[in-house]
Amino acid sequence: MSKDEIFKENMQSIADFTFSKNVASVFDDMLERCVPLYQEIQRMIVEMAVDFSVDGTNVYDLGCSTGTTLLNLGQNIQSNVKFIGYDYSEEMLAKCKQKLVEHQFPRDYDLICTDLNQGVHIENASVVTMLLTLQFIRPLRRDMLIGNIL
């Protein structure tokens, strides 16, 4: 895992944060250092998803970033499900695909680049996760996104 040093140097001005290639390359380190109990959150998501996943359905990860949650779900869910990861950043999805390939992810999956602010098509879902994603959705669009899930 690459170490996050993106904001180490002094900057004249700070641009808007984006999920760029530089961020994608250190994102896992960023989460480990900046999100208290991140591994425990992952463990709890997997525990609940295992209980709710149903054979023949889809498991969605909205804002899948580098694929950590998808990987953990795929290693623990025993049901015959398809995994679908959505993210707005092509760089994050590239890192996600790389991680799934490196870990020889044996499950059926799709990775889709889309702006969750525009809504998302959810069908035949038994589990939908949105770990640390909703805060990046515009407040006026959150109800619509949640409605797409329900």
Model-derived regions: residue spans:
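N-terminal, positively charged/glycine-rich alpha-helical extensions of SAM-dependent methyltransferases
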Residues: 1-26
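Conserved alpha-helix/loop element of class I SAM-dependent methyltransferases that forms part
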Residues: 37-55
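Class I SAM-dependent methyltransferase SAM/SAH-binding core
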Residues: 60, 65, 69-117
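Class I S-adenosylmethionine-dependent transferase superfamily signal
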Residues: 73, 148-149
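Short conserved loop adjoining the S-adenosyl-L-methionine
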Residues: 118-123
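A conserved beta-strand element that flanks and buttresses the S-adenosyl-L-methionine
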Residues: 129
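Hydrophobic adenine-recognition pocket in adenosine-nucleotide-binding enzymes
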Residues: 133
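A short, conserved alpha-helix within the catalytic core of class I
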Residues: 137-148
